[in-house]
Amino acid sequence: MANNTLDSISAWMKDPLNNVMLGWDSIVVMARHEVNYLLREEYISRFSSDTYLSPISGEVPLLGGRSKESIHDFILDAPRLAFSNNDLNKSHASLTCAILGGTQVTMTNNVDTWEAVRVIRIDPLQGPRLTLDLSLDSVPGIVDLDGGVSLDLKESDNFILTFAETIDDRKLGGNFFKEWFKTLPDSQRVWTLASIGAGNDNQMRPQSFKIRTQTNPAASLDRAAPDYGDGAVLVFIRMQGNQEGGDIPVEYRYLIPDDAGKNYSATVLFDAKRLAKAALLIGSFIDALNAVLVDFQFDTVYDTGSQAFEVIAYGGVLRIFTSEKELPFYFEGELVRAVFSNFGYRLPAYSIRPLMIKQTDHDGAVLTWTTTYLDLSYFTLPDNMHALEMRQDVTVDLRCTYPFAVNNNDLVVIPVVEITSSAANVVIKENPTIINGKPVDYPPLNQQIAQLKAEYSTVNLDEHNARIWAKLRHTLVPAVSVTSLIHEHIYFDHNRTLVVDVIRAPRDIAVFGRINPLRADFSISPVEHVMVSGSVHKFVVAPAGANVKWAVEWLQGDPEDYGAINAAGMYYAPVLPGDTSFSRMRITATHSTSGFVSSALVTVVTSQATLNPLIQVCDVTRTAELAAGEVSRGELLWSVKETASGEGGELRPSVLPDGDHTYIPRSPALRGKTYVLDEIIITSKSNPQAQASAWVLVTQKVPFLTIKLAANAAAGQVQLQAFANGNPLDPTRFKVNWEIGAKVTGTISDTGLYSVAQNTTDRFVLIFAWAQHSELGKLEGHIILPLPLARFARELGMMSDKTAP
């Protein structure tokens, strides 16, 4: 049952005890779910190759200082802004950037060297996210000259990068980006939210704003209910030349109506005084008065912004022409035509109180004028016999204000006029009544004369007032469309997607409508789609059968090959090279009749599934986290492929926030072994071809050998050397054996020279080394090298023997 109807909101606004505008010039209230949908549409439609920031690389030391995350060529997605549903006193928005590409290597210090213990290759199917909070109390709201509404993110906080397991390490990653964020120019740090119509009137040009979020008090508390979390985004706007309004109380009224069947999703309030100032411009009054007053002369007073706000007349007259009223009667069987005449007169603009028009804070504009005229009236019988001759000096006091009213759902200005007149020096001369040369004593005629005499200074003055107002009323109402003026200022994107349904004027002005109703009439599906390189997907529009023109636009990737789409909406994705993780395109459908455009964002990926980390080292007493993504976002089947029967660990759903799956090593540690190497495999339940694997190297004990890089290796090669207790193994005493584990990629010689395979797309190599000791038995060690080697010179340097020449 509706309990927040449009009528109840209007009644609340009408009550003078309620502070509706809180000192702000305009308040825009939008349903939060519609705003977030609109932001997603804007995100897609504004997407371009310029949206991407340059790839980011660097090091993030983790808590304790023993480990660091080395990030390489992180590609940030365009930021997505969304409003969370909080109360007015703790309003927040969040900005999320997915990491679409790059490599992450976790480095851990081992006494005198660093080791790579984890390698992650990021793509659009699986990767971390960068999130930050915008406390809407502290983020400055900016409106540029074109009406663009922007949020300057320099005041944002709580940067979180989900590239690590603990919240402390995630914050450290976020701080890395926070510091980097500060170095960005305004063009990349200031996020454009939408557009407020700036119009052509400085008085209605937005200058700044505050954004708040509000919970719908009628929303269900049941998480399963369709209206759970329902709420609104409120934008409080200050126009140029005004001060910002006051604080927004927590108990402020929820202003989106819930009338059954109406689907209202937006309400816009305008301060009536501010709107009146914009609608009732002094210049339009001057033009109107010039058209009706003879030789109108005036002085103009300007405000500090060079805007006329007062006009005072010092010359000119208003002419009222002679009016006649026939008063026929029958006398002795004949029709006698008697006439009551009011002679014309002139009302001087400069008189007792000169005609003045002034813009005010209360009524928008007010016209005042006190003037005098001489009223001459005659009651005349045939043969020009004046039965009555009357005259009086009349003082007229005129005041006109301009409140708003709603007429046929259109906001109009209806002038409210007050005209009072008073008479002085009244002279009435009554002459004998003569008809056809004969004196007449005819009772009906005598009664008419008596009535005219009695009403001369009362009813007759009212008629004069009506004549004056009839002369002024078409000219003192400026030719302005207030509704059109409102429409100029209430669209919140370039497509003007806020549609007005109802306008009310209960003191201030209220506009009730819907956000983006066109999407219910015409939209592309799916709005976002991920597909595999070389595959085909059919896009559709609703309603089915709509006549549209399809197009595809390159955004990121190979600009020479971004696929094609036919007239039926069938999109053919390009074939991506093996070293390219993804490419992005925009699909557009343009309606042939309305010209309305609906867009979809397409991400083409090389792999059907991704599993990360590609490899990681895990102590037998600990666990390892893994995360996967599949192109269809469907259910995945997880399994462990043991390299030795009975030694493998197991998988369980992760209990960590944002976690996916946890690998648990088999325990206790196996005696006589240094390593257990398990392969983790994911397979799409609906598409067995969508498969990916990763490796977990479980250390059963601390490896005896440490593998370091020796200097002076050729391009594409690294020379490895085994160390024990900080010293290289003596080749005269120990034969070191080398072996490539996990995925075999490249080659390694008997002397430990590793050579990368040509044109490989592998992102790591695991190399084992072992030597036989006469007393201690088999001594083992390992090293993980990120590939390709040339991209990871910094990490290779950290793994090098610092004593080597």
PLM regions: where:
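Solvent-exposed, low-complexity, repeat-rich "mucin-like" stalks and linkers
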Residues: 456-457, 464, 516-558, 600-646, ...
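Extended, charge-rich low-complexity regions and/or helical-solenoid scaffolds
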Residues: 454-526, 600-610, 698-705
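Low-complexity "stalk/linker" and mucin-like segments enriched in Ser/Thr/Pro/Ala/Gly
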Residues: 527, 549-574, 639-664, 739-757
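A short beta-strand micro-motif common to beta-rich folds, especially ectodomain repeats
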Residues: 575-595, 599-602, 665-689, 760-785
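Conserved small-residue-rich
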Residues: 259-343, 523-561, 569, 614-641, ...
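Intrinsically disordered, low-complexity segments that are common in secreted/host-exposed effector
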Residues: 522-530, 535, 552, 571, ...
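Disordered regulatory segments flanking catalytic cores
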Residues: 675-681, 685, 693-700, 718-721, ...
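Hydrophobic membrane/lipid-contacting segments
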Residues: 2-183, 187-454, 487-519
